[in-house]
């Protein structure tokens, strides 16, 4: 048997083995658990001198998927709570009714996203026996709250007064599409490590998510 024929046969055997490996996954269920780094432009409209914006947070993620085709799976997931905040701080002093006063304090506005849910599809394609790349798309179901909190101190005529409090000034919920891509590296026969990036929209604000999760087949 010449060298070229050996190479062809070896290639066919590898392809058959790969097809068999994929076929055994059809009809299986998998679970994922991980963390997602979230960044949003929800509060960028408040950007100005003296305003500090924190637009990143970390949320836990959980998901379940069903492989109904060699490449396609149906997925449902949960993304934990996250928030972005903008803090406006300052101080002022002067006189009122002939008596001195000074004010120092901070106002914080938060865009708080409660637990969100995803429903979508994932298309996977093998690169080699251990690595898959995939794309995903679906709907994100979200619930957003706007909170404002104030912490301040007033000193008037030598007496100091402190006030603080938090109030909700906005609430909305809805659903918007998401899409993303990623890669899955097989650690063993049942466990993989998924790394992906998704693009979402929450209440007209753009949200980016970079997640790392453990994927376990059953």
Each model region followed by its residue ranges:
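Repeated loop/turn-to-beta-strand initiation elements of outer-membrane beta-barrel proteins
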Residues: 29-31, 71-74, 130-133, 185-195
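Solvent-exposed loop/turn segments connecting transmembrane beta-strands
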Residues: 127, 173-175, 200-209
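Transmembrane beta-barrel strands of outer-membrane/channel proteins
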Residues: 31-37, 76-80, 135-139, 195-199
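Hydrophobic, lipid-facing positions within transmembrane beta-strands of outer-membrane proteins
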Residues: 29, 58-62, 115-119, 177-181, ...
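Residues on the lipid-exposed face of transmembrane beta-strands in outer-membrane beta-barrel proteins
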Residues: 62-66, 119-123, 137-139, 181-185, ...
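Outer-membrane beta-barrel strand-turn architecture
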Residues: 25, 67-70, 125-129, 141, ...
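Short glycine/proline- and aromatic-enriched beta-strand/turn motifs that initiate or cap beta-hairpins
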Residues: 21-70, 74, 141
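Extracellular/periplasm-exposed beta-strand and loop segments of Gram-negative cell-envelope proteins
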Residues: 39-57, 80-115, 142-174, 201
């Amino acid at each position: 048997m010449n060298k070229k024929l050996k190479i062809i046969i070896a290639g066919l055997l590898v392809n058959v083995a790969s097809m068999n490996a994929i076929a055994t996954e059809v009809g299986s269920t998998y679970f994922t658990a991980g963390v997602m780094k979230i960044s949003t432009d929800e509060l960028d409209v408040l950007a100005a001198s003296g305003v500090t914006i924190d637009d990143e947070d970390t949320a836990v993620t959980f998901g379940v998927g069903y492989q109904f085709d060699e490449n396609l799976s149906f997925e449902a997931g949960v993304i934990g709570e996250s928030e972005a905040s903008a803090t406006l701080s300052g101080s002022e002093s002067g006189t009122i009714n002939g008596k001195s006063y000074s004010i120092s304090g901070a106002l914080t506005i938060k865009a708080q996203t409660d637990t969100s849910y995803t429903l979508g599809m994932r298309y996977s394609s093998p690169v080699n026996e251990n690595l898959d790349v995939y794309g995903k798309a679906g709907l994100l179901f979200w619930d957003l709250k706007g909170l404002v909190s104030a912490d301040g101190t007033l000193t008037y005529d030598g007496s100091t007064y402190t006030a603080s409090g938090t109030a909700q000034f906005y609430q909305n919920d809805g659903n918007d599409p998401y899409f993303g891509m990623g890669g899955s590296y097989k650690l063993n026969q049942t466990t993989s490590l998924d790394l992906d990036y998704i693009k979402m929209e929450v209440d007209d604000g753009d949200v980016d998510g970079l997640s790392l999760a453990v994927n376990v087949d059953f």
